[in-house]
Structure formats: structure tokens, C-alpha cells
Regions:
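Alpha-helix capping at helix-to-loop junctions
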Residues: 90, 97, 118-122, 143-146
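Short alpha-helix plus adjacent loop in nuclease-associated cores
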Residues: 131-146
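Conserved non-catalytic scaffold segment of RNase H-like nuclease domains
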Residues: 5-114
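Substrate-recognition/cap helix-loop segment adjacent to the acidic, metal-dependent catalytic center
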Residues: 108-135
Length: 146
């Protein structure tokens, strides 16, 4: 079927997850872990990056328990939240074209990226556009074969 062919056509798969300060759109992404694998599932890249929480934000106590995050980790990271988002955006851009996937990506992670990029003065549709672009390239390739 077409979904199986799409997976076979992708040269890379990016599997990612986020840690956040809250489970709502008002929270901020504070950590991203990603692994890039080829079509044989061999690791060809990875990202594990943590940024500081934006100033003035109050994290959810429940999120801190889930993330095992201390106040020091939230406030004394190497990257400002803006620089952190830029590094993540650059990594995902370099990975494309690829299939992006994870455990709760559609319901949570992708939505958090959208709102965090928007709040951080970055292009909020960056991750979604990479995925749409990959689908369009595949569809065009399939149409040209007909």
C-alpha cells in the first residue's frame, strides 16, 4: 500500500521526544532528544539538548516530577530558550527530508513545538512543513511513475 511505500522511500527517520515545563500550550520545551536512523535503522545522528526555561515562567510541579528536573537545571542551562529552539530547528532542518515520528508527537510534541516556536519568534510551522514537503515529494514521484 502507499503508506508502506512511503516508509520504504524515506532515507531517514527522525525519532524524537520532548520534555516540557507544563502539559499545556503555555509550557515550554526544555529538552529534546532525537535519534536519526537510516532505512536499515542504523543510527546516523542524534541530538540531546537542554535549554533554560524562559524568564517569568512558573513550571508545573507535576512536569518537574515527570522530567526529574531540578530548578537548577531549569535556570542554569547552557542555552537560552531562544538559542535552544534555534539549535533544535537547525537540527531538524538538516535532517530533512526525513520521516519525523515519536510516541506522542501528534497530540503533544508537535503542538508544543508549534507554540514554542511561535512564542520564541521562530517560524511556528517549521516541523510540520518538513513533514508536508516529504509527503509532496513522494506523491509527485509516484505520479510521475504513472
Amino acid at each position: 500500500n502507499k503508506q508502506t511505500r512511503l516508509v520504504k522511500k524515506m532515507d531517514k527517520i527522525v525519532i524524537y521526544d520532548t520534555e516540557t515545563t507544563n502539559s499545556t500550550i503555555w509550557g515550554s520545551i526544555i529538552e529534546v532528544g532525537a535519534v536519526v536512523v537510516d532505512k536499515n535503522l542504523k543510527e546516523i545522528g542524534k541530538l540531546n539538548i537542554r535549554g533554560r526555561m524562559p524568564e517569568g515562567e512558573v513550571p508545573s510541579a507535576k512536569a518537574l516530577l515527570v522530567n526529574s528536573t531540578s530548578i537548577d537545571l531549569l535556570t542554569k542551562g547552557n542555552y537560552s530558550h531562544y538559542d535552544f529552539l534555534g539549535a533544535v530547528e537547525n537540527f531538524f532542518t538538516k535532517c530533512a527530508p526525513a520521516m519525523f515520528m515519536g510516541w506522542s508527537n501528534l497530540n503533544f510534541d508537535r503542538r508544543m513545538f508549534h507554540f514554542n516556536f511561535f512564542k520564541g519568534n521562530r517560524y511556528p510551522y517549521a516541523l510540520i512543513l518538513h513533514q508536508i514537503k516529504n509527503m509532496m515529494v513522494y506523491i509527485l514521484q509516484e505520479q510521475l511513475k504513472l
